[in-house]
Amino acid sequence: MRRMARKAIHSDQAPKAIGPYSQAVQVDAGKMTFLSGQIPLDPATMEMVQGDVVAQAERVMENLKAVLAASGLDFSHVVRCTIFLTDLGDFARVNEVYGRYFTGAPPARATVQVSALPRGSKVEIDAIAVS
């Protein structure tokens, strides 16, 4: 698997990241893969994972990991994510889970509070990966 050239961008003239994400990520664009938003569905049962937002975020990240793998990619290829939360009070707990999946400079990211998500999910995450 070829590693893409990627550079985390930081400007002291903009606010520092308040979570596990980069202000920007610059890549030498190769093949782009757009991952649809994942919610905490167990792929074996297609039922929602039981538990709090931490359990849901863990399942969401594992679902993203599976889709990345099916594309021949991993989290090191992700350059952009959007996190949708039904309660921004869950921001720190979701960050803890999310941050464990990125070993290098994390991707650029936005987090948005929404009024509802499919099947009553508390969290949904989509991603863009480049190889």
UniProtKB/Swiss-Prot annotation:
GO terms assigned for molecular function: deaminase activity
Top-level taxon of the source organism: Bacteria
InterPro entries: RidA, RidA_CS, RutC-like_sf, YjgF/YER057c/UK114
Residue pairs linked by disulfide bridges in the UniProt entry: none
GO cellular component, one term: cytosol
UniProt record similarity statement: Belongs to the RutC family.
PANTHER family xrefs: 2-IMINOBUTANOATE/2-IMINOPROPANOATE DEAMINASE RIDA, 2-IMINOBUTANOATE_2-IMINOPROPANOATE DEAMINASE
Official protein name in the record: Protein DfrA
